[in-house]
């Protein structure tokens, strides 16, 4: 009897020890992460046409008939450089495998997309006795985007508090815009005398077509406590978008709203304020380049769609809480 009780006691102790060991070795199921990232662009491409202006950095010199292009360089880059903040929910199926879903907000650095210095704006009417207007402008773009990023995570094992992991996933944009802000300076001369100066400002908002991107990351977490860890990730993402529509939401001259007003420098029409991006222009398109009837100012302008890149390599630092 005593022998049976002793065996029973040993069995209970063994089962308790095994249960405690399994509990200790069992990975957390749900976890959450808060992180902040900084990305650098990994590839540069030529920027799209901005308001009819080629993606060049042009410099003109001379006056009237002697106003000539003396320097031109292509403006290249991408919107892959910038800051991102995000929150992530994850679930571990096993010691090695898990899934995550991240919600991220990204703001790129501003990038110069087109620039011109001292170009004669009215070459057909300017003369030594009639007004000659010269324009200088800079157009800068910035992307702001909210996306969801589901991913599969492979944990590589824990040692000395560190647990490295890798993950791959997709990037699904939920909302985002490319904001293009252009500052123009129009300087008007009659002969050698300056008779007028107009500072014009416009803001164009480009909305993209639906698309999808891809990401891969290598990271590690480090335990700070029972449920709290710090983590760091090196992430690469490959992502391009192309425009669907563009709207001029602001246009001022010397600080006065002229969005829907005809001026010496711009027609305040639907065609000026709205653009529909297409893959092909033909004689039926609302574009003066291909339509023999010119532009219908009461309808949105048709322009060729082009791509901009948001690919980048970034470092994310943050805190992880495990349930």
Task: List each model region and its residues.
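Repeated loop/turn-to-beta-strand initiation elements of outer-membrane beta-barrel proteins
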Residues: 96-99, 160-162, 227-230
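Extracellular/periplasm-exposed beta-strand and loop segments of Gram-negative cell-envelope proteins
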Residues: 42-80, 107-147, 173-211, 242-310
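Short, solvent-exposed loop/edge-beta patches enriched in aromatic
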Residues: 81, 89-98
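Bacterial Sec-dependent N-terminal signal peptides
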Residues: 1-25, 319, 323
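Outer-membrane beta-barrel biogenesis signature
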Residues: 5, 19-53, 161-163, 280-284, ...
């Amino acid at each position: 009897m005593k022998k049976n009780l002793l065996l029973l006691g040993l069995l209970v102790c063994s089962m308790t020890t095994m249960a405690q060991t399994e509990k200790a070795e069992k990975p957390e199921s749900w976890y959450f992460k808060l992180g902040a990232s900084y990305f650098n662009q990994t590839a540069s491409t030529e920027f799209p046409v901005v308001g009819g202006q080629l993606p060049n950095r042009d410099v003109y010199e001379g006056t009237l008939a002697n106003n000539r292009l003396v320097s031109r360089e292509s403006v290249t880059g991408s919107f892959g450089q910038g800051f991102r903040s995000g929150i992530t929910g994850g679930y571990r199926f096993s010691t090695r495998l898990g899934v995550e879903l991240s919600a991220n907000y990204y703001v790129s650095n501003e990038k110069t997309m087109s620039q011109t210095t001292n170009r004669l704006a009215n070459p057909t009417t300017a003369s030594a006795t009639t007004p000659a207007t010269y324009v200088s402008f800079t157009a800068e773009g910035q992307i702001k985007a909210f996306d969801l990023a589901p991913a599969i995570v492979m944990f590589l094992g824990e040692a000395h508090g560190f647990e490295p992991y890798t993950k791959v996933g997709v990037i699904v944009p939920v909302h985002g815009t490319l904001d293009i802000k252009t500052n123009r300076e129009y300087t008007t001369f009659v002969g050698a005398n300056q008779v007028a100066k107009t500072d014009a400002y416009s803001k164009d908002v480009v909305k993209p077509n639906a698309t999808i991107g891809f990401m891969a990351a290598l990271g590690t977490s480090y335990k700070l406590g029972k449920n709290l860890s710090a983590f760091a990730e090196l992430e690469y993402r490959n992502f391009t978008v192309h425009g669907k529509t563009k709207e001029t939401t602001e246009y001022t001259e010397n600080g006065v709203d002229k969005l829907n007003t005809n001026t010496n420098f711009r027609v305040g029409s639907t065609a000026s304020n709205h653009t529909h991006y297409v893959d092909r222009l033909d004689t039926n398109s609302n574009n003066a380049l291909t339509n023999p009837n010119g532009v219908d100012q009461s309808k949105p302008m048709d322009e060729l769609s082009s791509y901009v890149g948001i690919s980048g390599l970034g470092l994310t630092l943050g805190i992880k809480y495990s349930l």
